[in-house]
Structure formats: structure tokens, C-alpha cells
A protein has these predicted regions:
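Conserved helix-turn-beta segment of the N-terminal RecA-like "Helicase ATP-binding" lobe
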Residues: 61-86
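Conserved SF1/SF2 helicase motif Ia
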Residues: 21-33, 37-67, 144
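Conserved motor-coupling elements within RecA-like helicase/translocase cores
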Residues: 86-97
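Switch/connector loops and helix/strand junctions flanking conserved nucleotide-binding motifs
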Residues: 64-66, 91-92, 106-107, 126-127, ...
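Short basic/glycine-enriched coil/helix segment immediately N-terminal to the Walker B
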Residues: 20-22, 92-93, 106-116
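Structural beta-sheet core signal
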Residues: 27, 56-57, 82, 149-151
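SF2 helicase catalytic motif II
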Residues: 101-102, 109-158
């Protein structure tokens, strides 16, 4: 799958950010602008170029299935699994795992180390340090202190 120029620019900006800075980037692409192909490209590169392990977090099973379908289309050679009660799958040993936050948020220490976590709909991460995403990300950083996190959203600001 060929990314559109603005999608490729977003992916390139993520790589530059991860290389040049220690904090975690947030990618803002409008609704229906193609966030999922960008995420799939990053997953593919993380596994094939950097031998990393990736977790993609989403909050509803429809997004999990959409991401799994796109990942298969973009990079069928990547070993990926799904961890979601709603989809009745609990894959844990894959290079890329697509997971529902409700199914996984108390299990960071049970899973093997991740090098990269991608959060779809990142605007759902609480600012106050509480909530499922914050709990999971804090626990995942205990497992791998060098963990990098990339957020994706169409709506980075809350009213």
C-alpha cells in the first residue's frame, strides 16, 4: 500500500521525532484521513527494520478489527495477533499485538516487553494520570523503561 504524501510526511515526522527527542509524539490526522495506514507502516518498519515489538491500543473492537485488516493489507509478512475479549482472541506472542485497552490494561506486567506502543484515539488518555490508559502505560514502562509511545488522533484538543 502506497501512503499518500501527507501520510508519508506524518510517518517521517514520527521517525524524526523518535530519533531526535526523548518525549513521545502525537500524530494528528483528520477523521477519515488515513491514520490506520500510517500506524500499519510504523508497525511494519518497527518489526522489519528495527526488530522491535509493537502494541497497538484501541478502545473499541471495531477499531481493533480495522487495524488488523489494514495491517494484513500493508504488511502481510508481519506476525501480528489480537488481544481482545470482544473478538474472543488472546494472542500474546506476536511481533505486533493489536489490543483493546479494556482487555489489557491490568496485564502489562504479564505480557512480554514492548518497544513501541501506538495509541489510536490518543485523546482518550487522561491528563490527570488516572484511567486505564495511564495505568497500562505506566506499568508497561516498568517492564521497559525505554518504551516509546506514539499517539494518533483526529481531535487532540478537548473543550
Amino acid at each position: 500500500m502506497q501512503l499518500r504524501p501527507y501520510q508519508q510526511a506524518a510517518v517521517d515526522a514520527v521517525y524524526n521525532h523518535l530519533r531526535d527527542r526523548d518525549d513521545n509524539p502525537c500524530v494528528v490526522i483528520p477523521t477519515a484521513g488515513g491514520k490506520t495506514p500510517c500506524m500499519a507502516t510504523i508497525c511494519k518498519d518497527a518489526v522489519t527494520l528495527w526488530q522491535g515489538r509493537v502494541l497497538v491500543l484501541a478502545h473499541v473492537k471495531e477499531l481493533l478489527q480495522q487495524t488488523a485488516d489494514k495491517l494484513t493489507a500493508v504488511c502481510p509478512e508481519v506476525d501480528f495477533g489480537i488481544y481482545s475479549a470482544g473478538l474472543k482472541r488472546r494472542d500474546t506472542n506476536n511481533a505486533v499485538i493489536i489490543a483493546g485497552i479494556q482487555s489489557i490494561y491490568k496485564r502489562a506486567c504479564e505480557l512480554d516487553r514492548f518497544d513501541l506502543i501506538i495509541v489510536d484515539e490518543a485523546h482518550l488518555i487522561s491528563f490527570d494520570g488516572e484511567g486505564m490508559y495511564q495505568q497500562f502505560l505506566a506499568d508497561a514502562k516498568k517492564v521497559n523503561p525505554h518504551l516509546r509511545i506514539i499517539g494518533f488522533t483526529a481531535t487532540p484538543f478537548r473543550l
